[in-house]
Amino acid sequence: MENENEKIYVIQKHDATHLHYDLRLEMNRVLKSWAVPKTPPIKSGIKRLAVQVEDHPLDYADFEGTIPEGQYGAGTVEIWDRGKYILKAKNDDKLIFEIKGNKLKGLYCLIRFKGKENWLFFKKK
């Protein structure tokens, strides 16, 4: 039986102008999205910059392939990790959520800092 509190979670490895990882979390019928310049934190003690970018449609969670030259985000996209997540706490500057992925598992945080788009992404101890 599916838990109604479980939402889509996916990280897409995006080899565009600069290799990065796109963290996507289902919220309000869209995928809230953050670009993470370095490998996402599998264990606690590692903090990563996560830059919030535009929302994506839910069906983008399954996208793998090539975005053609000349289009925004041109390059290759592959699914690096996927699963479900449960939101534990949320306010304007902080999200706490449990990830149930293949690579990432456990309690994670996104905390806003230095302006509107910049967040810290890390696994809680």
Listing of model-derived features with the role each one plays in the protein:
Residues M1-K125:
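A charge-rich, low-complexity, intrinsically flexible signal that marks solvent-exposed coils, linkers
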